[in-house]
Amino acid sequence: MKLTPGKLAGLKKVSNDRGVIAAAAMDQRGSLQKALAKEKGSAVSDAMMEEFKSLVTEVLTPHASAILLDPEWGLPASKRRSKNAGLLLAYEKTGYDKTGPGRLPDLLDNWSVRRLKEAGADCIKILLYYTPFDGKEINDKKHAWVERLGDECRANDIPFFLEFVGYEEGVDEKGFDFAKKKPEVVIESMREFTKDRYGVDVMKVEVPVNMKFVEGAKSYAGQKAYTKKEAMDLFRKAASVATKPFIYLSAGVSNAEFSESLELAAEAGVKFNGVLCGRATWKEGIPVYAKQGAEAFRKWLQSEGVKNINNVNDRLKAASSWHSIYEVEPAMVGA
């Protein structure tokens, strides 16, 4: 598979020299607003959202290959990123449609791929809530939606990152029952969206297990859904269905738990191509910003935030370059 010139240029901008994506995510909107308001005890202004995102971007991007932001509150932050870091912009509205079943997605009303590119995006990111267990009527809508996005990114010659997050209505997605189902949700989602018809250049995926239920893991909470060997087999099985590069998302777990999942992927010999890691890096700083303000948060980021991102970066030594997947010659990488 070869990339078009614009897609190749965009992917190189968000990757390190090795062709690994070591990106930070700061496109959280509704969930971040709620978390800040809860800690602060009052409403959160637009200026606070912009300031929080700008501080994370300024302090963490010297240690990242890229930052993922949203065009609603993240554009001022995008101007404060380090020169080494590329920019991914989110195109979807925060959350999902709660008026009917299926967690259907929606795009930002005043944005298009063309406009995101004009705002400085090197790559476009879309989040989709998806489960292969939903009915055909729901998933057919989602498949058509992703096809349209793939075509819009192709028309603008910009890389398309698709993030899919599994779910099951009426079930605790952090609980044991979903942990048993999660591998199949992740594997079948990857099998679907790796198809060329969707035009996805990089899949942003969940790890296929819940580490809290892996027997013998440091994160193990006492109830077994899988042995360590079974968990490693599931990592390998998920990787085996991918024909496109894939990177892991942190899904709001702790830095220690996310780091351990990357170690397990490495031990399983999985050729993952990087991470897009958000809350595992900065979420513990939310109360610091809400209660003590910008300077205290900056100091927290400079110590704890940087430590967290370096912790993840250390685990990326085991990640594989996407160059070989897209037949990029070593001589072309610097071009």
Where are these regions (language model features)?
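Surface-exposed cleft-lining segments at the edges of enzyme active sites
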Residues: 124-140, 171-180, 218-223
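Alpha/beta catalytic barrel-like cores
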Residues: 1-136, 199, 223-227, 244-245, ...
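Active-site glycine- and acidic-residue-rich loops that bind
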Residues: 2, 134-143, 175-187, 250-260
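Glycine-rich anion-binding loop/nest that anchors nucleotide
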Residues: 202-207, 245-254, 274-276
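Active-site-adjacent beta->alpha loops and helix N-cap segments on the catalytic face
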Residues: 73-78, 132-154, 161, 212-219, ...
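Structural recognition of alpha->loop->beta junctions
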Residues: 120, 176-205, 265-276
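Flexible glycine/acidic-rich beta-alpha junction loops that bind and position SAM and/or redox cofactors
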Residues: 33, 170-175, 201-220, 280-292, ...
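Conserved, mostly hydrophobic/aromatic
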Residues: 24, 163, 203, 278
